Amino acid sequence: MSEMPTPVNFTEAAASKVSGLIQDEGNPELKLRVYITGGGCSGFQYGFTFDESQAEDDTVVEKDGVKLMIDPMSFQYLMGAKIDYLEDLQGARFVIENPNASTTCGCGSSFGV
């Protein structure tokens, strides 16, 4: 388990939204897992899920008491990324600004390296 500072920026807005969702679920053991899968129009897709269990090799980023976990395979693609939550005219959503992505699709949910 790695809990050292990491080059992933988990914003206060994202942590606050996750905290509210965890409260809605009524399970304080939940943590947000961010992961990468193959697929999407650009080759890779971002995924978000709640998880109670933390693997030994997960990288953990904590912000305001909320834990974000990233598995080692996904972490290599997310180094330097900013994980944020936005509410604007396009709606409310989690957004990943990833400097490793050489291409992204129009909706921002998939990318290529």
UniProtKB/Swiss-Prot annotation:
Keyword Iron recorded: yes
Record's signal peptide: none
Binding locations of iron-sulfur cluster: 41, 105, 107
Pfam families named in the record: Fe-S_biosyn
GO cellular component: cytosol
Record note on cofactor: Binds 1 iron-sulfur cluster per subunit.
SUPFAM superfamilies: HesB-like domain
Keyword Transmembrane belongs to the record: no
Cross-referenced InterPro entries: FeS_biogenesis, FeS_cluster_insertion, FeS_cluster_insertion_CS, FeS_cluster_insertion_RrpA, HesB-like_dom_sf
GO molecular function: 2 iron, 2 sulfur cluster binding; 4 iron, 4 sulfur cluster binding; iron ion binding
Keywords: Iron, Iron-sulfur, Metal-binding
GO biological process terms held by the UniProt record: iron-sulfur cluster assembly
The protein's required cofactors: iron-sulfur cluster
Job description of the protein: Required for insertion of 4Fe-4S clusters for at least IspG.
Family: Belongs to the HesB/IscA family.
Oligomer status and interactors: Homodimer.
Protein name, as recorded: Iron-sulfur cluster insertion protein ErpA
Source organism per UniProt: Hydrogenovibrio crunogenus (strain DSM 25203 / XCL-2) (Thiomicrospira crunogena)
